[in-house]
Amino acid sequence: MRRGRNQSAVIIISTFPNKESIIQNVNDLIIEKKLCACISLVPIRSFYSWSNKLEDHEEIMVLMKTTKSLATKLKLEIARLHPYDVPEIIEVKMNDVSKSYLKWMIDSIKS
């Protein structure tokens, strides 16, 4: 699919057990495969039910900024690399993105 200037931007959100589990793949996702323009890591504390038990874990929320045309490839790559049995992989459309930021994103992920 062509990556033109008329792209819409999305954020792919996922959680990982620690920084090391994502940092080892950042260079590959951004530089080599050019699947996203930027990855932000945010420390969080997650509470969730797993096997009928309440879980409480510190995790890293990962925000990956990319274009709609690359979102599916990026989500497949995250699923392939992810250490969890059931990874959280969410796509959110970015609204009201500045033209300069969108241009930078598109330029950053051009082949």
Label every model-predicted segment.
Residues 1-111:
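Positively charged, small/polar-rich N-terminal and surface patches that mediate targeting and assembly
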